Structure formats: C-alpha cells, structure tokens
Regions:
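Compositionally biased accessory segments in Actinobacterial proteins
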Residues: 1-379
C-alpha cells in the first residue's frame, strides 16, 4: 500500500518548464479532477498523455497565464506548485536519443495516488524505484521502450531530492511473479544531466539488466526441466510395476505446462551459448535442442490457435469441440520432452558458465555535446 504525506493537497497542479517556450502542467491528488477543471477554465490544452500544456511567445504572456491559472485553481480548491526540474518528457526524449538502438519515450500520468500501485506487479526491480512506487508518490513517469530488444524501462524524478532521476525495468514478456523476484536488477540513480544519465543507463544499467534476465531465464528453464525430470522418474517407476496408459497421459499433461516455459525462455539461452566455441558433442546437443524447440514452438502455436484464446480450456470443452485433440497434442510433444530430458543439462551447464556476455556490448553512447548545444524537442 502506498503511503502519502498528510500535507499533500487533495488537488494539485504541478508546472514544469519545457523546451520551446512551453509549460507543462500535471493535475494530481485524490481530487485531481478539481485541478483538471481549473486547467480547462484557464485555457490549458490537454494532450493525449494527460499532460496539459500552454505555448508562450514571451515571458509576460506566460506570467499572465500562470496568474490566471492560480486564480482558477483557487476557485476549484487546487494548489499550484512550480517544479524546479525541467519537464520529464524532455529529459526522456534526450535520453532516448542518446541510448544505443531505437528507444521510444512515452509520458504517463498517475493523477490519482492509487494509480501508481498498478505498476507494482509489472515492475522488476529490487532498488529505489520499486520503493518509491510503493511508499512514495509518483505523479508521473516516462516509459523508455526498445521493442527491438524487448526492454521496457521506467524513468521517474528521484523522490526526496531536488535533482536526479531513477530508472528501472518492467519485467519482460513471459514472466509472472515479478514482485520481490530474487533475480530482479537494482534500479539506477541517474544524474540531472540527460546525456550523462543516458551514458549511465547504457554503460551500467542495461548490462546489469541483461545479466539478471539471463539468470532468470536460466532459472526458469532449470526449474521446468527439474519438474519434468521428477515426473518422468515417477512415470518410469509406475509403469515398471503397473503399465497403464493413464500414467503417460498424466505425465504429458503435466509436462506440457513446463514445455511452455522452455519454449518461451530457452531460445535466448541457446543463442547465448552459441556465442563462444563449444565441444563438438555439446554443439550437436544444442542443434538437437534447437530442432526440438522449433517443433515445440509449432505445436504450442497450433494448440493456442486451435483454442482461439482459450489455452486453459477445461477437458469438457476440449472433448466437445476437439475430440481427441489433447491426446494428439501429447503424442506430438513427447519427442520434444524426450530431447530436453536427454540434452537439457548440456544447455544449463553452458548457460551457467561464466565468460560469455548475455548480450553483445552496446554501441558507444555519443560524446557529450558542447554545453551551449541542445537538440530540439521532437514534436
């Protein structure tokens, strides 16, 4: 549960100076709609991300507009505060352009204090970021997304400090139970200067993030293989004393759910292991695992496609609409299971081995520009 200071106004408007003679306003508080009404009454325009803006051609016009806003805010029982920081969206734009690869910044506004709590299950962090979201008030943030690399970061102003930022990660696709996950990377405290902040993210945070992701993927595959192996051992024991097709069906049903994790998380591990030389026998094992993954991926996609979004459909539904489908699925996936039982330990041994970087070294961050030079804000 997020806690808030008793002195926090029920409705508040936070003003930040943007590039290009623009001022951004964010409405927050348990009665944030009062603040929104004041902004509308004062002639501020709401953007698609929930931020209100006004563009001014001269300082005097800006001062008059802010004075008008203050009076409107009083009528609507809202407080107006001016941030000492530049607009976070501008900072994120600069950082995104300095990071290696294609990054897209997206501003998010959490007007009501409880909205930020929706972030908690999705954040994958063991540092200051998750603490700030849980115990403080985060009125707005910026996502930095690299769809090519599958990395999604969250950037916030550092709570309790007049300068600086904090950046951490959302969990990548394919993972649940992210809260207090033992492999979670630690969010990074960033300097106020966006160019140096980008360098810190590229040089320190992203390598640590990918190392943590590699460890989590390895643990997920190891756990899945361990459960498959335990069930397979029990199957062998049961069928040795009392052969029964029902035992095989039960094993395949259980193993199917573990195969889903293997199909999701093993491909990057194999790619990781292929980055260095392998003994011939191990290389052949990797080739067999890759072939099994290809088959497994096709079976999983076909199964989910057949169910049209009902991957956990009950047996009665399957028997009615797809008689015999599960038995066919189980027979098809059995060679995939056997391949991983035979060669999975080879993958895990190399995945655990030190000496291979989880990702290629990132491209160098561009050199810092002269102090007087500043890129234009994208529109």
């Amino acid at each position: 549960m997020t806690s808030y200071a008793a002195s926090t106004p029920p409705a508040q408007i936070i003003l930040s100076v943007c590039e290009g003679a623009e001022i951004a306003a964010i409405a927050t508080g348990e009665q944030y709609k009062w603040a929104q009404s004041a902004l509308v009454a004062a002639g501020w325009e709401r953007t698609g991300n929930g931020v209100y803006t006004r563009l001014f051609s001269e300082r005097a016009a800006a001062e008059r507009a802010i004075s008008t806003l203050v009076h409107a805010a009083r009528r609507h029982r809202a407080a107006v505060v001016t941030s000492t920081r530049p607009y976070l969206g501008d900072i994120a734009d600069t950082i995104a352009h300095q990071l290696p690869g294609p990054w897209t910044p997206t501003v998010e506004v959490y007007s009501h204090p409880v909205w930020q709590e929706d972030l908690v299950p999705w954040l994958w962090d063991s540092g200051e970021l998750i603490h700030a979201v849980q115990a403080g008030q985060v009125t707005h943030a910026t996502r930095l997304t690299n769809e090519t690399a599958g990395v999604d970061l969250l950037l916030i102003e550092r709570p309790g400090h007049s300068t600086g930022y904090v950046a951490g990660a959302f969990a990548p696709d394919g993972f649940d139970d992210n809260f207090e996950n033992p492999h979670a990377p630690t969010s990074i405290v960033l300097p106020q200067d966006p160019y140096r902040a980008a360098a810190e993210i590229a040089d320190r945070y992203l390598p640590a993030y990918h190392q943590a992701l590699h460890a989590r993927r390895t643990a997920a595959v190891a756990s899945a293989l361990s459960r498959i192996r335990d069930e397979h051992t029990e199957l062998q024991h049961l069928t040795a004393t009392e052969p029964d097709p029902a035992y095989e069906e039960r094993f395949a049903d259980m193993a199917w759910h573990e195969v889903l994790d293997v199909v999701k998380h093993a491909p990057p591990l194999i790619e990781h292991c292929r980055r260095g030389p392998l003994p011939l026998e191990d290389s052949m094992a990797m080739t067999r695992l890759e072939a099994a993954l290809g088959t497994g991926t096709t079976i999983v996609a076909g199964w989910h496609g057949m169910l049209s979004g009902r991957p956990d459909a009950p047996r009665a539904y399957l028997n009615e609409h797809f008689p015999g489908a599960k038995a066919i699925r189980n027979r098809s996936i059995r060679p995939v299971i056997d391949a991983w039982l035979a060669d999975g330990d080879t993958l895990l041994r190399h995945a655990h081995a030190p000496g291979r970087a989880p990702i290629p070294a990132p491209a160098a961050v561009p050199a810092l520009p002269p102090a007087a030079s500043k890129p234009a804000r994208p529109r």
